[in-house]
Amino acid sequence: MIRILVSNDDGVNAPGIKALTEALAEIATVLTVGPDRNCSGASNSLTLTNPLRINRLDNGYISVHGTPTDCVHLAIRELYDGEPDMVVSGINAGANMGDDTLYSGTVAAAMEGRFLGFPAVAISLNGRKFEHYQSAAVYARRIVQGLLAQPLAKDQILNVNVPDLPLDQIKGIKVTRLGARHKAEGIVRTQDPAGREIFWLGPPGQEQDATDGTDFHAVANGYVSITPLTVDLTAYGQLTALQNWVDKI
């Protein structure tokens, strides 16, 4: 039986991870390990200065007092009896498109699976009301089944964004590149009840590159976007120019 590790960044009790677990349980044995609280925006952070504590829940899930990356690392290195065949992260409440991927704990959980040598997928639901987790779950299962039947290179992560629509209104799947956002909006300055100054990060910037071919464009037009991501951040096109610059300094 195929074995799949499921994690997320919204927390182990979030509706998205439940929908994903149930959908994948129809085709695989699933171990669900997620953070014990919402860790949105945690990116690839690891907990290095405190121990990781776990709680085995009545539904079989395992909660971890740690980050999404902690969850996947701990699950594969210690909690799994053997190894998973794949790591799937989500279903995130909110899109992870364009620059979002740099901050996303959902993408980071999948990335940790890839670091440890396993095929990995991140699934996110784009919208405001988050009414159609089941639509995302159906597409997640379809994509996972495709990967099991025809594996892709292990050095990539599939970043999947699903529009928050009824299943019959989703037009299909498009392979996309990452779009881009404008810089985030300003910091919100306020006070706590004791009158002390506090700050909130402003909302993300609006789309800057949402042209045809981007994840933003596909999802806005009713398609599921799939973007292959790599963890190699090297700007290969700049190596020669940089060497020429270094030679002159």
From Swiss-Prot:
EC class: hydrolase
Highest taxon, organism lineage: Bacteria
Coiled-coil portions: none
Cofactor requirement: a divalent metal cation
Principal subcellular localisation of the protein: cytoplasm
Annotated EC: 3.1.3.5
Cofactor binding, note field: Binds 1 divalent metal cation per subunit.
InterPro entries, per database record: SurE (IPR030048), SurE-like_Pase/nucleotidase (IPR002828), SurE-like_sf (IPR036523)
Locations listed in the record: Cytoplasm
Keyword Protein transport: no
Name of this protein: 5'-nucleotidase SurE
Lineage of the species this protein comes from: Bacteria, Pseudomonadati, Pseudomonadota, Gammaproteobacteria, Alteromonadales
Gene field: surE
